[in-house]
């Protein structure tokens, strides 16, 4: 966790810590004078009530792909769990191009306001009505940026500051991280799902003149069907 430029250890290797820890970090943010707080909320956290009691101003759903089926068992269960975040939020921001959109739109009666973003279809926020520059590679990064744009605009952040944030953004370690670049290039990326592999490999392939060698491993005791 990063609060007012200071890093805090959230403990175990989990994206969203326990409800108690989440509230502690929220209090730290409030005490530090932070105006906005971004909380990555996993399906496990939603299902286990780790964010229970939090009134989200904006809930953002990036995409719903083949992930965590060892826990949720079916795609439908996974989608319904992810949708809980949107029901907890005053404003729901969703990917208009994602295959889950049709089902998500069926939850409209539970969502106060629905805002869409996308590249291929007629979305509220798209590269045509909000132009931006970025050095990040891959279509998936464009989608992530559009999601952030939609959320920021709903929070009243100016277009100038949004573009400034996009242009200055640096990916965290382990995300498209080039660790060697001499006689060949070596890159580390966190991709570990079928969709993530497809996206990163499609993005890197045009940049490679010769062979593209992909090495990956499995942590085990997870969704084996991946």
Indicate residue ranges for each PLM-predicted region.
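Conserved nucleotide-sensing/catalytic segment adjacent to the nucleotide-binding pocket
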Residues: 8-42
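Short, glycine/acidic-enriched loop or turn micro-motifs at the edges of active sites
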Residues: 43, 66, 98, 191-193, ...
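Conserved helix/coil segment N-terminal to the catalytic DExD/H
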Residues: 44-52
